[in-house]
Amino acid sequence: DRILTILTPLGQRSAIARGVRREKSRLAGGIELFAVSDVVLRRGKGSLYTITQARLDRFYRQILQDYDRLQFGYECIKLVERASRDVDIPEWFEVLSETLAGLGDVVSLQLVQVWFYLRYAELTGYELSLVNDVTGQPLDRQKRYMYDSIERGLRLSEQGELTADHIKFLRLAANKSLRLVA
């Protein structure tokens, strides 16, 4: 038997997969990391569900072939699992599904990372303001900015690396799906 944490469109669920370690288990093929599966859950005793059926929908095998994508995939799963314990909302499923799809479709890793972190920050309540700087002033197209990690926002700086083009891209990534941005 194996106890799993499953992220569903309805939120995070803990479930037990009985007999999944047996060689001829029907459930084993439908329960994979880096995959989206159709799973049938039956309410068990307490808060633990029982998995009665599992069928693999999409398996992102390409993630396993690139170490950097694999590591980032693990990091995303870990961050979303922790965050969804505190804020259990359906959006986590969408964010993680789209991130895995991007990692599996060989979209630029940096693009997937930027998109994921912007979504993650938004859902955890630390959304990056792309309208005002940390002092509350509107962002100016003619000026340069840097990210202030203490204030968690953009700060006006002559040596800043963020220009109007960067901010325009960040706005696009923050408001559109990863597929559209890619």
Task: Give the ranges of each region predicted by the language model.
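Non-catalytic alpha-helical scaffolds and adjoining flexible linkers that form interface surfaces
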Residues: 1-3, 7-182
